């Protein structure tokens, strides 16, 4: 009963002395500058501030380890985080990053319990209270308060990817140059005919169906009208092509200067949009229906090549008697050069006096007797004839598929089944 229990104050003093001894021991090992200070002075500073500030190490030998504003710099001058390997050049960014480790959220909303470590997050949150929506979609009336929501809306609603227009135009020109370099290869031209989707085609119909051609041209792409305008001016003015192409945009000029092999690939797909032989073509009330008459297709030649002679058909009121042609090219080989007769478009026998006489050069055109297509180039003609079978002209020479007629044969290649 005579023993006295130690007072709590004595226990706190003993624990503080123990902490001071451990602190001095650590400072001696690390060579810190704080070791020069007395333990009493250190305890006084801790008592006044209530916080233990980290030591500021100054290394004069290694400049990469110097501390600026309490942050260590790396060898390339960036500020390094003391908790991880993150480094940045901006002090404000590093302070925001350190708040991830410390959990500090100094930016608080005065209307609700929301708090954030980033000021920009608080600004976006305040728009939910004010109702402000500064970000608007340029394709619809959608508005939002955050830019990330607008990006999500564009991807989900309009299927738009974050791609710049300048880069897409550059990649288009690069792809065009590659196609022009590879266009000299015969095998590559065949692959273009089979695989590429057609952008446009020049179409020539009888005069009885000219009023229906206007409805067909509305469905063509914009650059198809450029080709049509250049083709119509061939027989009138040699400079018509240059003026027609010069009036278009830069992208239209690139399409007009494309390789002729690329233009050949446009033929198969456009044939699919033309009615089959079983369906009667629409005619005007005052014109006669010609069941044996077929439209004539012409594959355009590039602008740099000599201008092709325009092919004009007689008016629908005058019947057309085509010259007899063999049903199959018996003397032709699919892989050999020109082997079909070079013919010209027949003119009407009893045409009206005001009808212009067709002007054409048989040496410029190569005719396919099966598909009724005229080619201004021997290479284009050879590639096309190589797709026909030897025994059966409507049998695919690549996969052996048998087609019923020229329409079915063109649709077979338009499906793009050959890889």
Curated annotation (Swiss-Prot):
Residues 208-228 have a biased composition (Basic and acidic residues). Residues 310-320, 341-360 have a biased composition (Polar residues). Its main location: nucleus. GO terms for biological process: determination of intestine left/right asymmetry; determination of left/right asymmetry in lateral mesoderm; determination of left/right symmetry; determination of pancreatic left/right asymmetry; regulation of transcription by RNA polymerase II. Gene3D superfamilies: Classic Zinc Finger. Residues 203-255, 310-360 are annotated as: Disordered. One of its GO terms (cellular component) is nucleus. It comes from the Eukaryota. The keyword Cell inner membrane does not apply. One of its GO terms (molecular function) is chromatin binding. A zinc finger (C2H2-type) spans 79-101, 107-129, 135-158, 366-388, 394-418. It is found in: Nucleus. Keywords: DNA-binding, Metal-binding, Nucleus, Repeat, Repressor, Transcription, Transcription regulation, Zinc, Zinc-finger. InterPro entries: Ikaros_C2H2-ZF, Znf_C2H2_sf, Znf_C2H2_type. Probably self-associates. 'Pegasus' was the winged horse in Greek mythology. Transcriptional repressor that binds the core 5'GNNTGTNG-3' DNA consensus sequence. Belongs to the Ikaros C2H2-type zinc-finger protein family. This is Zinc finger protein Pegasus. It comes from Danio rerio.
């Amino acid at each position: 009963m005579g023993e006295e229990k130690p007072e709590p104050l004595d226990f706190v003093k003993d624990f503080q002395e123990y902490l001071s001894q451990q602190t001095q021991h650590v400072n001696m090992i690390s060579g810190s500058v704080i070791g020069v200070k007395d333990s009493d002075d250190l305890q006084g500073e801790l008592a006044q501030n209530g916080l233990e500030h980290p030591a500021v190490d100054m290394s004069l030998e290694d400049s990469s380890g110097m501390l600026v504003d309490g942050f260590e710099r790396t060898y390339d001058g960036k500020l390094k985080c003391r908790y991880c390997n993150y480094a940045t050049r901006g002090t404000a960014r590093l302070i925001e990053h350190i708040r991830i480790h410390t959990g500090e959220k100094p930016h608080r909303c005065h209307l609700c319990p929301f708090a954030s470590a980033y000021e920009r997050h608080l600004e976006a949150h305040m728009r939910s209270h004010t109702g402000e929506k500064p970000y608007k979609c340029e394709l619809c009336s959608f508005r939002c308060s955050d830019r990330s929501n607008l990006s999500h809306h564009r991807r989900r609603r309009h299927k738009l990817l974050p791609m710049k227009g300048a880069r897409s135009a550059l990649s288009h020109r690069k792809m065009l140059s590659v196609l022009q370099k590879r266009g000299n290869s015969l095998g590559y031209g065949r692959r273009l005919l089979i695989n590429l989707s057609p952008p446009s085609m020049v179409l020539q119909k009888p005069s009885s169906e000219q009023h229906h051609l206007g409805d067909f041209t509305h469905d063509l792409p914009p650059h198809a009208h450029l080709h049509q305008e250049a083709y119509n001016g061939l027989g009138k003015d040699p400079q018509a092509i240059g003026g027609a192409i010069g009036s278009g945009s830069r992208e239209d000029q690139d399409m007009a200067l494309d390789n002729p092999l690329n233009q050949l690939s446009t033929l198969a797909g456009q044939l699919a949009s033309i009615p089959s032989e079983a369906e009667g073509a629409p005619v005007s009330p005052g014109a006669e229906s010609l069941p044996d008459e077929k439209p004539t297709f012409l594959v355009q030649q590039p602008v740099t090549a000599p201008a092709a002679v325009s092919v004009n058909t007689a008016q629908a009121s005058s019947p057309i008697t085509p010259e007899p042609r063999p049903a199959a090219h018996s003397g032709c080989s699919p892989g050999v050069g020109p082997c079909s007769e070079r013919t010209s478009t027949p003119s009407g026998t009893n045409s009206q006096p005001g009808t212009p006489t067709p002007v054409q050069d048989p040496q410029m055109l190569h005719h396919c007797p099966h598909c009724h297509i005229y080619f201004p180039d021997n290479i284009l003609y050879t590639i096309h004839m190589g797709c026909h079978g030897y025994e059966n002209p409507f049998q695919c020479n690549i996969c052996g598929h048998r087609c019923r007629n020229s329409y079915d044969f063109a649709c077979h290649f338009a499906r793009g089944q050959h890889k």
